[in-house]
A protein has these predicted regions:
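Fe(II)/2-oxoglutarate oxygenase catalytic core
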Residues: 1-98, 104-130
Length: 130
């Protein structure tokens, strides 16, 4: 787990990418990210279909993201699927890749069948939708 300077560098880099993605694709009214979550999925681990929208006071999660930390050769299964209509969008497994999607989109992590999948996930808050 990153601490100290490593954590500061990582959080700064992720924040820069959040701003870039939002400017390029979403243009949401955002305030800032929650603390990052380091996720470990071992054989049999999964996360069933859900949405990330969470309301706190006058703010809500608007943008979700995941960063692939494992080499795809180190595990099987564990695909992240985001639903946008009938067919899910399966996110890539390339180590270091970062994917963004609106927090209101249904998504899931399929069961890991071999090895361990590691990822960094997070959410960005903004004022409630108008």
């Amino acid at each position: 787990k990153p601490e100290g300077k490593e954590a500061t560098w990582l959080f700064t880099h992720v924040t820069d990418l959040i701003h870039y993605a939002n400017r390029s694709w979403y243009r949401y009214d955002l305030i800032g990210p929650e603390n990052l979550q380091y996720s470990i999925y071992k054989v049999g681990s999964f996360y069933s279909e859900h949405i990330d929208t969470l309301y706190k006071n006058q703010h809500c999660r608007k943008l979700s993201f995941t960063v692939q930390l494992s080499n795809p050769d180190e595990y099987e299964g564990g695909e992240v699927e985001v639903y946008n209509g009938e067919k899910p969008i399966v996110l890539g497994k390339e180590i270091g890749s970062m994917y963004f999607f609106p927090s209101y989109m249904v998504h899931e992590v399929k069961p890991v069948t071999r090895g361990t999948r590691k990822a960094l996930v997070g959410w960005v808050h903004g004022p409630q939708w108008k």
